[in-house]
Amino acid sequence: MQNHHTIFVCQETPCLSMGSGAVYDALQEEVERQKLKNATIEISGCHGHGLCEQGPSVVVEPDGIFYTHVQAEDAAEIASSHLRDGKLVERLLYHHPVTGKAIPRYSDIDFYRKQQRDILRNCGHINPEKIDHYVDQGGYRALRKAVLEMTPEQVIDEISRAGLRGRGGAGFPTGRKWELCRNAPGDQKYVICNADEGDPGAFMDRSILEADPNALIEGLTIAGYAIGATEGYVYVRAEYPLAVKRIHIALQQAQERGFLGNNILGSGFDFMVHIKEGAGSFVCGEETALMASIESKRGMPRPRPPFPAQSGLDGKPSNINNVKTLASVPIIIERGADWYASIGTEKSKGTAVFALTGKIANSGLVEVPMGTPLSTIIFDIGGGIPRGKRFKAVQTGGPSGGCIPAQFLDSPVDYETLAQLGSIMGSGGMVVLDETTCMVEIARYFLSFTQQECCGKCAPGRLGTKQMLELLTRITQGEGREGDIDILLSIAQTVKECSLCGLGQTCPNPVLTTINYFRDEYEAHIQEKKCPAAVCDALMISPCQHTCPVGINIPKYVAHIADGEYLESIETIRERNPFPAICGRICHHPCEGRCRRGELDEPVAIRALKRFAADWYFDHVSELPEPEPFPQTQSHKVAVIGAGPCGLSCAYFLAQMGYPTTVFEALPVGGGMLSVAIPDFRLPREVIQKEIEYIAKRGVEIRYNTPINVNFTVEDLKKDGYEAVFIAAGAQRSQ
């Protein structure tokens, strides 16, 4: 007899955008067409599985088989091969990005295996639109225990002993927050869930609402019981229609089952939950602005005190918690404070959920114990940086967070450590940046967002963010001036210390941390008018040319080769580099690392094309016009000491400028370390000799076996009429 299978088809926002709706319909049709009585098709919160770029995803339970990139046309094969014959569809399985090995079960994939999913415990394993699925997983047991077996004070004590801290910002102790609200005088109190989540690239709260809304409702109801509230609000963005839909369904089903409403579970406790759809204002993530929005006022922060626990929504004592905080409450009540406190660090307990995005192989939701090193999250779980790029920094905490450089990769992720590094935990955004990221531009990008979203109520937020943005924009456009960095630091510190709300106080973090850790990039923009990452358009023509150490016009010579104009190509290269054949063999080609084509598949083979053009030239040199010496338009003689690549390059360009130039070399051969250090199989000697002969033909005199020493000094060169001496003696010996 065939085992019964439950097929969970991701129906969350990312997978829906990739066509999972059609996959769901196709699987339904195939199960019916093939008359498979051993299969049930369910929608799921597979977005909570977290591996977003692998969607649309399908999970076949009870074995946990994970299919990726599933399309509607794959449904017939899944139904016939897997569901009917028991054979896995290997081409749709997840494959290890390095080894290419197929990994059938999602629990064996490093991305999942190295996580600890407590907050996301049900995401991807249940149908979020069926409360029975949640109940079957132990849902609402914690609520039953709280309202029937515990007093409100005992609930608060359990949360306090667990060490739960707010997962939406500064990490204020949740138990303490509840206690303050419970002890505040007043007959009417409110509990509010902040599900606004306005950070760009953050989708943790939305994922929980879409994949496991009952966990939030249960946590919110327990919070209401603990502080003595009879009403609660879920403040969610109207631009999250699927999340709004599923929280509505969950609320209706919870009320029908007696988990909400009057006399919950016969306990005498009454509690109702309302949904307030926000208009998408970032500042409404701040708790006082959020309450103003619920009151149908303009969402603007207000000074504190009084704090929300004293005077919040409608002037009543109110408690506001984040989605992840409330979703943690049921497991604490059910499993106990001691269990929860055993996870994490001494001051940061439990797990944290992060939205891992940016330049990362595996983007998605990650849940790990507090104190997990950044390196574990980024490399072991996230799979590292794609396309062989180098890790540069990670930005945590959303647009108000800081950028943490590579030297702190082994730092534990907890509230205290992130604060010491100049960043914040925030709502859990984690944007990975690689070597192609300009840190000045990233600071400008995040500040442009916070400046646009600033409510303008306080002068530091209204004017300070505008002034910082103007300075950063000026710097990225190549118009930065000396002193701009110090001005930025001064304004940022003022905004941080004087802003009215937490958003204003943290928005300078990207500026402060990028200056602190990447000041050299700011100085390059201002002093050299150069963007080291080749990102700022105003400071470059093309990324490859900008990155080339000698600034060769790479697009031009590549275009010449494409048109069959090989001589014009080599002439273009020699405008900036007299060694095209040598560099075509041994250059480390940083230009290819910045090639825009590499973002699609593979970079253009710039070095190989350079070698091709140079080899073509020397293969056809007898058919080409003989190179003529550059005309000598200057009367000042110049001596160059050393016939290595530096000395020969200097002599070549001096001759090009019209100066009579002579190179003095102690050895019997030119090329310096090119000739005496690089093996012949890597750089043939005849290639070096051809390049040197070309330089000599352009008018550079080279005198071998002529060391400059005590017997023949620089003063002797001056006596011989040389008015300038360039010393390119090299560094043959270690310091």
Which role fits each region the language model picked out?
Residues C15, I159-C181, A223, G280-A292, ...:
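Conserved phosphate/anionic-ligand binding catalytic regions in large, soluble enzymes, centered on
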Residues K114-Q115, V244-M370, G382:
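Hydrophobic alpha-helical positions that pack around
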Residues G647-L648:
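N-terminal Rossmann-fold NAD(P) dinucleotide-binding loop
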Residues F172-T174, Y557, H589-I641, Q656-M657, ...:
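FAD-binding core/adjacent interface of flavoenzyme oxidoreductases
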Residues M1-H5, S20-I43, P62-R91, H133, ...:
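Ferredoxin-type iron-sulfur electron-transfer modules in oxidoreductases and energy-metabolism complexes
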Residues L93-R161, D314-G315, N321-G336, M540, ...:
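Flexible inter-domain linker/hinge segments
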Residues Y659-S675:
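Glycine-rich FAD pyrophosphate-binding loop
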